[in-house]
From Swiss-Prot:
It comes from Shewanella baltica (strain OS155 / ATCC BAA-1091). Transmembrane segments: none annotated. It comes from the Bacteria. SUPFAM superfamilies: Ribosomal protein L14. The lineage of its organism: Bacteria, Pseudomonadati, Pseudomonadota, Gammaproteobacteria, Alteromonadales. GO terms for cellular component: cytosolic large ribosomal subunit. Pfam families: Ribosomal_L14. Belongs to the universal ribosomal protein uL14 family. This is Large ribosomal subunit protein uL14. NCBIfam families: rplN_bact. InterPro entries: Ribosomal_uL14, Ribosomal_uL14_bac-type, Ribosomal_uL14_CS, Ribosomal_uL14_sf. Part of the 50S ribosomal subunit. Forms a cluster with proteins L3 and L19. In the 70S ribosome, L14 and L19 interact and together make contacts with the 16S rRNA in bridges B5 and B8. GO terms for molecular function: large ribosomal subunit rRNA binding; structural constituent of ribosome.
Length: 122
């Protein structure tokens, strides 16, 4: 469950390392975002000479949460850290590589590009 002020790791090679959620998109008073949801983020920590600079604002899709996601068979997939992938205005990933596993729930949305780039799909 990601809400405003939550900090997340970045799971792509866009250059950002840590981002902070500044808005959960979808609905006027929507409070929480889960895996597969789009959020607005601000870059808090970035590597030098990268595409994403500190202070930049991007859209991002949540790919891993500590809360996890419940499957129809009753199993729950949880992760140790919260992570997101930065997106451009067309909701395409900025980076060309994805680090760490992602869940199958991203396949249902418009994020097949992220699923195909990920090293492991749970």
């Amino acid at each position: 469950m990601i809400q405003m002020q939550s900090t997340l790791d970045v799971a792509c090679n866009s250059g950002a390392r840590r981002v902070q959620c500044i808005k959960v998109l979808g609905g006027s008073h929507r409070r929480y975002a889960g895996i597969g949801d789009i959020i607005k983020v601000s870059v808090k920590e970035a590597i030098p000479r990268a595409k994403a600079k500190k202070g930049d604002v991007y859209n991002a899709v949540v790919v891993r949460t500590k809360k996890g996601v419940r499957r129809p068979d009753g199993s729950v997939i949880r992760f140790d850290r919260n992570a997101a992938v930065l997106l451009n205005n067309n909701l395409q990933p900025i980076g060309t590589r994805i680090f760490g596993p992602v869940t199958r729930e991203l396949r249902n949305e418009q994020f097949m590009k992220i699923v195909s780039l990920a090293p492991e799909v749970l």
